[in-house]
Curated annotation (Swiss-Prot):
Keywords: Cell inner membrane, Cell membrane, Chemotaxis, Membrane, Methylation, Transducer, Transmembrane, Transmembrane helix. The modification Glutamate methyl ester (Gln) is found at Q295, Q309. Signal peptide: none annotated. This is Methyl-accepting chemotaxis protein II.
C-alpha cells in the first residue's frame, strides 16, 4: 500500500502535517500571548488606578492633618487672631486638597474594570462627601469659626472613605491574585501543549522516517547497487521495484537504460566486426590507389614538360607576330607619308598649270600688243611715205619698229606654243600624279588592313600564350595535387590500419559486458600491415603540406 504513494505526495503530507502543527502551536501561542497581554494590561491598569487612589487618600489625610494642626493653633491663640502659621497650614491644606483632586480626576479618567465598578462607585460617593467636608473645614478655619469646625462630623466621613479605600484595595488585590493565578494556569497549560506537540512531532518524524526509508532509501539503495553492477559490465541482472512512486519510475528508467545499453553493446559488437572487415578492405584499396596515383603523377609530369615546350613555341610565334605587326605598322606609316608627299606634288602640279595658263594669257596680251605695234608701225610707214623726203627718217624708224614688233610677235607665238605644250604636259603630269596619289591611298589602306590583321594575329598569339600558360599552370597544379593525393592516400592507408586496430580494441572492450543471452565469443583479430610500412612515393615536385586546392580538385 505504501509503495503506491508517490514521494511528492508523502512529502506534501508531511509538510502539511507540520504546517498544521505549526498553525495549531502558533494559534495556541498567540492565544496565550493575547491572554498574557490582556492580564498585563489589567494589572497595569489596576496598578495605575491603585496608585492614583492611594495618592488621593494620602493627600486628603495630609489635608486633614494640616487642618487639625491649624485648628489647634487657633485654639491655643487666646486672641483668636490669624497667625502666619495658621495661614501657612491652611495654604498647605488647600494645595494638598487640590493635588488630591487632581489625582482623583486621573483615577476617574481611567475606566474601571468590570469587577471594580461597584467599588469605584462606592469610593466616588465617599470621596465626594469627604472632599466637600474638607472644603468646608478649610472655609471654617479661614473665617476662624472653630465651633463649626469641631461641630462638623468629618471623622465619620473620613472613616467611611477609609473603609471604601480599604475595600477597593482588597478587591484590587483579589483581582491581581486572580490574574497571577490565571497566568500560572496558562503557563502550565502551555507547558502541556508544548509537551503534546513535541510528542506528536516525534511520532510524525518516526512515521515520516519509516515512510521515507520504505519508499525512498531502500529502493534507492537497490537502484544504486544495480547501477554499480551495470558500471561493472554486468547487464544480465534485472531490477524489479513494485509500486507507482518516483522510485518505481526511476527503476523502470534504469531498466530501460539497461535494455538500451544491451542493444547498443550488441550492435557495437556487430558493428566492430563489420568495421574490422571494412578497414582491411579500405587499407588494401588505399594501397592500390596510392600506386595508381603515383603513375598518374608521372604522366602529369610528362604532360607538364610538353606543355612547357608548347608554351615556348607559342611565345616565339607571338613575338614574331608582334615584330611583323610592328613592321607592318612602320610600312603603313611610310605609305601614309608617301601619300602625303604625292598629295603635295599634285597640288604643286596644279599650281604650275595655273601659272602656265596665266603666262599664256600674258603672252597673248604681248602678242596683241606686238600686233597693234606692227599695225601702228605700218600706219607710220604709210604716213612717212606720204611725207616724202621729210618723213624718210621716220619711215626708217617705223620699219625698225615693225621688224621688232614682228619679231616680238614671232617670239610670243613660239613662247605661247611652248607654254601650251608645257601646260599640256603639266596636265598630263597632274593626271598621272593624281593616279599615283590614288594608288598610294590604296597602298596605305592595304598596309593598314595588313597592320590590323597582324595586330589581331599578335593579340591572338598573346591570348594563346596566356591560355597555354594557364593550362601549364593547371597541369603543374594537378601534378602537385596528385603528389599530395599520393601522400594523403598513404596517410589514409595508415589511418585505415589504425582504425582496424581500434576496431579490434573496441571488440575486446565490448566483450567485457556480460549479457543475459549467450555471450559473443571474440574471434582472433589479425591486424593487417599498416600503410606506414608501404614504400612511400617519391614526389617529383614539391608537395605543400596544406593546400586549399585539394578540395577543389
Amino acid at each position: 500500500m505504501i509503495n503506491r504513494i508517490r514521494v511528492v505526495t508523502l512529502l506534501v503530507m508531511v509538510l502539511g502535517v507540520f504546517a498544521l502543527l505549526q498553525l495549531i502551536s502558533g494559534s495556541l501561542f498567540f492565544s496565550s500571548l493575547h491572554h498574557s497581554q490582556k492580564s498585563f494590561v489589567v494589572s497595569n491598569q489596576l496598578r495605575e488606578q491603585q496608585g492614583e487612589l492611594t495618592s488621593t487618600w494620602d493627600l486628603m489625610l495630609q489635608t486633614r492633618i494640616n487642618l487639625s494642626r491649624s485648628a489647634v493653633r487657633m485654639m491655643m491663640d487666646s486672641s483668636n487672631q490669624q497667625s502666619n502659621a495658621k495661614v501657612e497650614l491652611l495654604d498647605s491644606a488647600r494645595k494638598t486638597l487640590a493635588q488630591a483632586a487632581t489625582h482623583y480626576k486621573k483615577f476617574k479618567s481611567m475606566a474601571p474594570l468590570p469587577e471594580m465598578v461597584a467599588t469605584s462607585r462606592n469610593i466616588d460617593e465617599k470621596y465626594k462627601n469627604y472632599y466637600t467636608a474638607l472644603t468646608e473645614l478649610i472655609d471654617y478655619l479661614d473665617y476662624g469659626n472653630t465651633g463649626a469646625y469641631f461641630a462638623q462630623p468629618t471623622q465619620g466621613m473620613q472613616n467611611a472613605m477609609g473603609e471604601a479605600f480599604a475595600q477597593y484595595a482588597l478587591s484590587s488585590e483579589k483581582l491581581y491574585r486572580d490574574i497571577v493565578t490565571d497566568n500560572a494556569d496558562d503557563y502550565r497549560f502551555a507547558q502541556w501543549q508544548l509537551a503534546v506537540i513535541a510528542l506528536v512531532v516525534v511520532l510524525i518524524l518516526l512515521v515520516a522516517w519509516y515512510g521515507i526509508r520504505r519508499m525512498l532509501l531502500t529502493p534507492l539503495a537497490k537502484i544504486i547497487a544495480h547501477i554499480r553492477e551495470i558500471a561493472g559490465g554486468n547487464l544480465a541482472n534485472t531490477l524489479t521495484i513494485d509500486g507507482r512512486s518516483e522510485m518505481g519510475d526511476l527503476a523502470q528508467s534504469v531498466s530501460h537504460m539497461q535494455r538500451s545499453l544491451t542493444d547498443t553493446v550488441t550492435h557495437v559488437r556487430e558493428g566492430s566486426d563489420a568495421i574490422y572487415a571494412g578497414t582491411r578492405e579500405i587499407a588494401a584499396g588505399n594501397t592500390d590507389l596510392s600506386s595508381r596515383t603515383e603513375q598518374q603523377a608521372s604522366a602529369l609530369e610528362e604532360t607538364a614538360a610538353s606543355m612547357e615546350q608548347l608554351t615556348a613555341t607559342v611565345k616565339q610565334n607571338a613575338d614574331n607576330a608582334r615584330q611583323a605587326s610592328q613592321l607592318a605598322q612602320s610600312a603603313s606609316d611610310t605609305a601614309q607619308h608617301g601619300g602625303k608627299v604625292v598629295d603635295g606634288v599634285v597640288k604643286t602640279m596644279h599650281e604650275i598649270a595655273d601659272s602656265s595658263k596665266k603666262i599664256a594669257d600674258i603672252i597673248s596680251v604681248i602678242d596683241g600688243i606686238a600686233f597693234q605695234t606692227n599695225i601702228l608701225a605700218l600706219n607710220a610707214a604709210v604716213e612717212a611715205a606720204r611725207a616724202g623726203e621729210q618723213g624718210r627718217g621716220f619711215a626708217v624708224v617705223a620699219g625698225e619698229v615693225r621688224n621688232l614688233a614682228s619679231r616680238s610677235a614671232q617670239a610670243a607665238k613660239e613662247i605661247k606654243a611652248l607654254i601650251e605644250d608645257s601646260v599640256s604636259r603639266v596636265d598630263t603630269g597632274s593626271v598621272l600624279v593624281e593616279s599615283a596619289g590614288e594608288t598610294m591611298n590604296n597602298i596605305v589602306n592595304a598596309v593598314t588592313r595588313v597592320t590590323d590583321i597582324m595586330g589581331e594575329i599578335a593579340s591572338a598569339s598573346d591570348e594563346q600564350s596566356r591560355g597555354i600558360d594557364q593550362v601549364a599552370l593547371a597541369v603543374s597544379e594537378m601534378d602537385r595535387v596528385t603528389q599530395q593525393n599520393a601522400s594523403l592516400v598513404q596517410e589514409s592507408a595508415a589511418a585505415a590500419a589504425a582504425l582496424e586496430e581500434q576496431a579490434s580494441r573496441l571488440t575486446q572492450a565490448v566483450s567485457a559486458f556480460r549479457l543475459a543471452a549467450s555471450p559473443l565469443t571474440n574471434k582472433p583479430q589479425t591486424p593487417s600491415r599498416p600503410a606506414s610500412e608501404q614504400p612511400p612515393a617519391q614526389p617529383r615536385l614539391r608537395i605543400a603540406e596544406q593546400d586549399p586546392n585539394w578540395e577543389t580538385f
